[in-house]
Amino acid sequence: MLDLQKKLSPAFYTILSLPSTAMGFALSVQISALSWILSTQYNLAIHEIGLVWAAGPIAGIFGQVIVGMISDEVWFWGGRRRPFILIGGTLSALMLLALPFIGVISTGLGFESVVGIAILIALTLDLSINISFNPTRSIIADVTPSGNERTKGYTWMQTISGTFGVGAYAIGAIWGNYALIYVGAIIVFLISFIPIWFIKEPEKLSEKEEVLSVTPDKNKWISALFSIKPLWGFLAYAPLGMFKKLSGQSLSPGILELACLLLTVYGIFQVLKQPESEVANQRSNEIGFQRILAAHAFTWMGIQTMFIYMFAFIQNKMNFLSENDLGKVISLSFLLLNAVAAILPAIFLQPLSEKWGKV
């Protein structure tokens, strides 16, 4: 163990924050460049771009759940989090590099359409980011004592990751999205692959953390599936919609959408109808988690719509822009969004929470 880690010095907190920063940076590149490059370089229609984006989050949801379960219980390559960070960081960098070459890859593999390869690359990129997200956060808890030191670790992570995220959009706004893709791939690989070798993980978690990490239900995979009940409709719609599009199958308009909407409403109703106060503590925590999922699901519908389709809005409203300038405007827009998101909580929300209380 390095002296930096023993002393929990600022340098160690910086190193500890970099793997999570890498995943956040990769996500920023994806948000800024994926829709833009699919539209401008590969001429995909707006509904095809939505199809490409649908693949990633589904894999990400399952990836986070699965990796979150198994990363507590494995040990290889000198750690329980290290393998997932190394694999996820390397694959994320490679998939970013693949974005400008989707057409070349598709032609080389003998595909007439780039949609299938674009879905595969987007799927791998999103899955790579998501399988690393939980380990990059869990490693902070693994190597810091509970209390102020652990809180400090997460604070450093948020600060450094947020700064890099704003920096990603700044690169795209100034030099364009192609520069962002190539620079992003290098940064993601370096700050995910190198720092993790300077962090020594404990081979045995503390007794309290072991209890929290072990799911008492023997059928933990089924338990995990039921814990995300409010997302069932969303989870079903994306793969079924992709299959319908790629296979050429036809359904009556709105049938699939209505069925998935009803499934979503059913899942949310099941969560909301049972008061947390009337169930055991562990079940109460699960219900609270499911209610957060329900709220976030609809929130993310709006946010993802902005991420995916903002390029089309700008193309329509500012059709005088060149393809490169379009990419710069998209990056500038997300730069301003993230800058406001970084400043607003400290300046406005914190004073309001102190006045009216936190919820």
Segments the model singles out, each with a brief description of its role:
Residues T21, L51-I58, L123, T155-T163, ...:
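Transmembrane alpha-helical cores of Major Facilitator Superfamily
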Residues V29, A33, I66, F133-I139, ...:
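Transmembrane alpha-helix boundary/hinge residues in polytopic small-molecule transporters
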Residues F62-G79, G176, I343-K358:
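Helix-to-loop junctions at the C-terminal end of transmembrane segments
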Residues A59-G63, C260-V271, S331-P351:
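Transmembrane alpha-helices of Major Facilitator/SLC transporters
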Residues M1-S9, L109, V115-L120, I131-S132, ...:
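Intracellular loop-helix junctions on the cytosolic face of multi-pass helical membrane proteins
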Residues L2-G60, A236, L240-P253, F289-F320:
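Helix-loop boundary and gating motifs at the non-cytosolic
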Residues A45-W53, R81, V114, A118, ...:
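Juxtamembrane helix-start elements in MFS-like secondary transporters
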Residues I85-E112, G241-K245:
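C-terminal ends and interior cores of transmembrane alpha-helices
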